[in-house]
Swiss-Prot record:
<comment type="pathway">
    <text>Carbohydrate degradation; L-rhamnose degradation; glycerone phosphate from L-rhamnose: step 1/3.</text>
</comment>
<comment type="similarity">
    <text>Belongs to the rhamnose isomerase family.</text>
</comment>
<feature type="binding site">
    <location>
        <position position="262"/>
    </location>
    <ligand>
        <name>Mn(2+)</name>
    </ligand>
</feature>
<dbReference type="Pfam" id="PF06134">
    <property type="entry name" value="RhaA"/>
</dbReference>
<keyword id="KW-0479">Metal-binding</keyword>
<comment type="subunit">
    <text>Homotetramer.</text>
</comment>
<comment type="function">
    <text>Catalyzes the interconversion of L-rhamnose and L-rhamnulose.</text>
</comment>
<feature type="binding site">
    <location>
        <position position="296"/>
    </location>
    <ligand>
        <name>Mn(2+)</name>
    </ligand>
</feature>
<keyword id="KW-0464">Manganese</keyword>
<keyword id="KW-0684">Rhamnose metabolism</keyword>
<keyword id="KW-0413">Isomerase</keyword>
<dbReference type="InterPro" id="IPR009308">
    <property type="entry name" value="Rhamnose_isomerase"/>
</dbReference>
<protein>
    <recommendedName>
        <fullName>L-rhamnose isomerase</fullName>
        <ecNumber>5.3.1.14</ecNumber>
    </recommendedName>
</protein>
<feature type="binding site">
    <location>
        <position position="294"/>
    </location>
    <ligand>
        <name>Mn(2+)</name>
    </ligand>
</feature>
<dbReference type="GO" id="GO:0030145">
    <property type="term" value="F:manganese ion binding"/>
</dbReference>
<dbReference type="GO" id="GO:0019301">
    <property type="term" value="P:rhamnose catabolic process"/>
</dbReference>
<dbReference type="InterPro" id="IPR050337">
    <property type="entry name" value="L-rhamnose_isomerase"/>
</dbReference>
Amino acid sequence: MSTPIETAWQLAKARYASLNIDVEAALEQLDQIPVSMHCWQGDDVAGFENTGGPLTGGIQATGNYPGKASTPDELRADLEQAFALIPGPKRLNLHAIYLESAQPVARNEIAPEHFRTWVEWAKRHQLGLDFNPTCFSHPLSADGFTLSHPDEKVRRFWIEHCQASRRISAYFGRELGTPSVMNIWVPDGMKDLTIDRLAFRQRLLSALDEIIAEPLDQAHHIDAVESKLFGIGAESFTVGSNEFYLGYAASRGTALCLDAGHFHPTEVISDKISSAILYVPRLLLHVSRPVRWDSDHVVLLDDETQAIAHEIVRHKLLNRVHIGLDFFDASINRIAAWVIGTRNMKKALLRALLEPTETLRKLEQNGDYTARLALLEEQKSLPWQAVWEHYCQCHDVIPGSEWLQQVRQYEETILTQRQG
């Protein structure tokens, strides 16, 4: 006797088949799309340097929900709990401050050995790893400048940190058999009116060129650079603007990172994908949810998340676009935040794969915009949820909201026992 989920799956499959959509082929494709989940949701971007310093760089994690991870083992345990509730392929995105060492390590001296435990853990869980140098929350970034700093000694420190980070990223790729995407974002900017913008950008350009000068195998490591409109304390001038990094990625052949919260509130990165991909070899996406500013709220299954997925799938860019998440909400259960956001990204990808894109494309090419709009709206109410629940069951993942019960149980038995 079939279950309600199985019955719904068979009905959904037939409904989509009537529109010439192969649901099983869509699920096979979904199984080839990893989403890179960010580790820093689990501890509010604290890391394991244990310096006691504040989070800086014009970013904030607001809230004080109990039970955040404070050790590498706690963070990995929390990640495992989240991964168990998310179907399909996944990656983990690490920042340099998540190193493990018995002794303090200067950021310009970090090495693969400080991330060996992460690599062994990733092997056990069949995960790829991505990486980021951490150019904030440090005494040498306290004045708001790193790679564009006027002081050559400070600038040299951050150049060396990024160079060391690239070698760690390449180590990830070699060990795990999948390239690590390493994204460079720096908080460099000015609170108020800035006279010599060009000098700051010239220094950043020179520093980046020095950082990527060491040849690394792209089968192991991919460079990416990320812009931002502004940050707290850098409202008037950001050195690494969109124009700067688009030009840099296009001229140097790096990937360009588009963060959903790093543009003006009236801009969306879904509209930028098809333009930027004409000029750069790859894109890295930081899917987030900005609420009036780069607030990094948990990703919803909203119009923009869906539009991002549509742009990737419609233009067959899955081999050139790397999907990562970037949010950190300390006001709710952090494991639930991971699960909600990552499942929503995967749901958006599934819905995009189930779209009758070629039919819509022909309508557009023929100028039948009435039918295009009608079909776009009608397909929103097709039974994609039944397909999603079947997909979850195929991966031994709880399909509906019942997953929250497991999170609550983990919270009661594990998170409530933690200090702080």
